[in-house]
Structures are given as C-alpha cells and as structure tokens.
C-alpha cells in the first residue's frame, strides 16, 4: 500500500481538499484499498479544527463529504510512515526539508509539479479568499498525481492481436511473472495476481478483436473475470 501525506500551513484548506479529492478519485476507480491518503499542517495554529467552511462547501458541491476531518500537525515520525509527502508552497517545503533532515529518501514533492507546473505554488485561500482558484489548482495537481500513481503500477495486457489460446498465454508470460502453465483452470493466475510478484500492481486489459475466434474471446473473458475478482483491474 502506497501512503500519501498532503501538507499545507494549517491543514484546514488546501491539504485536506487534496486529501479528499484524491480519495474520491481512488474510490471511483476501485483503487482506494491500494493507497492510504491523509493530510497535515506544518503549524499548530489550527490543530483540532475542521475543514474551513468555504473549502468544505466546494467539496460538498462535488459530492465529497469531509465530515470528521480535523487538522493535525506533521511530526518527524511521519517521514517514515509515508511514501510521498506533498506540499503546496515553498514555505511548506522549507519547513518540511528542515524537519526531515533534507529529505534523504526523496519523498517531498510539490503538488503542481504533477500538473506539469514545476515549482508553481498553490496560494493559501485563507489569505487570498480565492477558494475556487485554489480548488481548481488542487484538482489539477491531484489529477496529475493520480495518473502518475496509476501508470507507475499499471501493467497492460494487449489481447487485441491474439488469434488463438497460445497467443493469450504468450501475452500473459511476456507481461507478467507467468510460468509455462497451460490448463482449463485459472488457479495459477489467481495465485500470481495475489502473490508478491504483482503486489500493488493494477492491470488494463485490451480485449481481443471482434474477428478473434469464440474460444479466444471466451477465455479472455474468463481471464478478465479473475482480474476483477482479485480487485486489480482498472479497465
């Protein structure tokens, strides 16, 4: 499981919004169990307070409920707990870099870097009062982050060229930790999907062409069903 921590100054506007936007994306795509997402503040000024009402209103307008979320302050121990620690501006970055001993494992990231805006900051709407602007920028960053997370862990199986069962087996062997296995059952495939070689991976299956034989289509459907049951299929 990949663990992600969003950071802003007070943990009542930007970072909780990013937390819940990304959670929503992961839930809608069936990936929520593959990631743990949270948020925190670099300051202690808002500890215990809920999401700032204008940002909470924007979340609700998009069907996202952030009830129960309260601000907390980031701690040095969080560096070991999370795989990615994503900040909103350079002030956040400087504080985190100092707290985490200059980021020896390279975990610190700027959110808008994921949107192709290297070094760009998301201004604190508590001061600017530009809540919609902050929302738009956070959403853009989260969309880029989501694509990066999914692409990093995604394996594509292309059955569109398969004309017989041997082609299907060859595609599985070439793209997965797949042994020379043939048979009518798919128990081996289940073991591979849920075992260590592909732990944390997601899969995209490109189906056979319409011109493929019925036996190929039928077997490809059975393979797809195993991926769905294992909870690792994106599309």
Annotate each language-model stretch with its function.
Residues 84, 90-150:
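Phosphate-binding/catalytic loops
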Residues 1-81:
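Conserved active-site segments centered on acidic
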Residues 152-235:
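Positively charged, polar, low-complexity stretches
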Residues 87-88, 183:
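Short beta-strand scaffold positions
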Residues 79-80, 101-104, 196, 227:
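Short, conserved loop/helix-junction motifs that constitute active-site signature segments
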Residues 69-75, 96-97, 190-192:
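A generic local structural motif
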Residues 36, 65, 107-109, 153, ...:
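Conserved beta-strand segments of alpha/beta enzyme cores
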């Amino acid at each position: 499981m990949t663990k992600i921590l969003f950071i802003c100054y007070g943990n009542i506007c930007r970072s909780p919004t990013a937390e819940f936007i990304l959670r929503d994306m992961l839930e809608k795509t069936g990936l929520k169990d593959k990631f743990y997402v949270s948020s925190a503040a670099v300051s202690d000024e808002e500890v215990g307070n809920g999401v700032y009402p204008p940002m909470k209103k924007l979340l609700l307008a998009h069907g996202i409920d952030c009830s129960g979320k309260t601000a907390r302050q980031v701690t040095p121990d969080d560096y070991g707990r999370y795989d990615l620690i994503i900040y909103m501006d350079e002030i956040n970055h400087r504080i985190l870099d100092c707290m985490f001993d200059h980021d020896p494992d390279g975990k610190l990231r700027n959110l808008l870097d994921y949107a192709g805006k290297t070094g760009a900051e998301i201004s604190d709407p508590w001061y600017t009062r530009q809540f919609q602007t902050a929302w738009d920028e956070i959403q853009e960053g989260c969309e880029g982050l989501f694509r990066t997370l999914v692409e990093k862990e995604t394996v594509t199986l292309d059955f569109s060229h398969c004309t017989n069962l041997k082609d299907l087996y060859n595609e599985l062997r070439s793209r997965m930790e797949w042994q020379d296995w043939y048979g009518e059952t798919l128990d081996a495939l289940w073991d591979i999907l849920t075992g260590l070689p592909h732990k944390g991976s997601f899969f995209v299956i490109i189906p056979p062409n319409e011109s493929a034989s019925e036996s190929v289509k039928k077997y490809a459907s059975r393979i797809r069903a195993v991926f769905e049951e294992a909870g690792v299929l994106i599309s």
